[in-house]
Amino acid sequence: MSIITKTDNGIIYKLKDELVCIEAYGRDIIRVRITRNSTLSDEKWTLLDVEDCSFETEITEGKASVTSGILRSEICDLPWGAYMLSFYKNCSLILRTHEEGEYTSKFEHTDGQNYRTRIIFDARDDEHFYGLGQE
């Protein structure tokens, strides 16, 4: 069972040894960070500063969402002890984590508190992504 906490600009979702932070980062911008560390880094990894914006959070047992403008990100428990992360634009599903057991995400420890993360997503056939990721 997950533990979900509301923050100043989103939610923190904890399940087993993973910590997922979903934040409204500006109008129509949602930032998601995932770690196996006990806390999230305060390091500024993004190119943009956080913008003040209106957003909504909704938390129920085993499920939470953050909405900023036309975007919504939702995370929910799955029966086998994993979670599904979904993204919506104008209430229409555009992307979600692949639903095939808990091995759709892989964490490789690199050094110190750093991990390389690989996550499998199911996207729509007409969806294209450019410039994702940071190394």
Predicted regions and their residues:
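N-terminal accessory segment at the very beginning of proteins
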Residues: 1-135
